[in-house]
């Protein structure tokens, strides 16, 4: 064979391969039919179907039809329940021993993404319980902790594939006994509740000063750009401070504030401080005394992420009652049931069901507490949390009634792909790339 023919022999397959890879991927359609579809936001469809197109929900109803073709996969639910994927808005899984940077009471520059262990089997265990999205938070050792990361439970996927795309940023604040205990045991500030809030207030004052410095710098650049005799390069930027930069984002509304808190009096103090500095509180986490101040929470559009009936495990939990979630909800508070546990996250459906027993929540109200409400707390309710057209196809097929101790997930889909199948328990490990 001549050199020229040999070269063509080698190049042509490469060109064909490149051309093939350049072609758009064939559309992928899934139709789940014969399901009891619990949408979370628009009631239940007794004999419903869901059409998924390229990972998004395309249609929901009693009868849906996808374009015919070999690319359509049919899943017969066999009359079983179909719900949105469960969302845990307070989790510490896959962070191992890196939950708390307890070297300073103010550490907003910490990023939980840097501690995220995407191979942690706890991700898969939660997935097996129907959890598809989690907010991984800094711990509660510090008055102002680090920045959270939002993940999808695509166990076996790459690290970047697990990160929830374009999720809003959140930061963890904490008040009460935990910061007191951590720093008080070292005989340093804070060691009291007044110390806690003094530390928080001082950090926010410093952030205000930092913002003013940067605002003045940017104003000078704008003035110099308008003045032909001046160069914008003449303006000297302030020194960057990652801690104050993060807190400035809080004050600008670019970082949602999630607060670990138990007592009613502390909630009122945090509300007052937020008004003092002009930022919004997204949610109070734990919030076991929310029932005492539910009117104030509703008036300020502050959600709670709470336990169903966990109480008495620490001093701050002595006034907890199992009716807390429903009492707050009846006052207009957006309520989520969260785990804060590698065990509870697999049973959040049962925890939500307890609100039906304690307080008389309806089926839809209970389901919202583990789907659309925590999605709102995380800031992703436009993408997940309900079975609606245009949302990510994060879905769970249950082998029994989901709001009971008898229903367990049979299949869990994330972005239209099956990541858990009870009949194929090793499915997730095959996704590793």
Where are these regions (language model features)?
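Bacterial N-terminal signal peptides
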Residues: 7-18
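Polyanionic/metal-chelating signatures
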Residues: 127-285
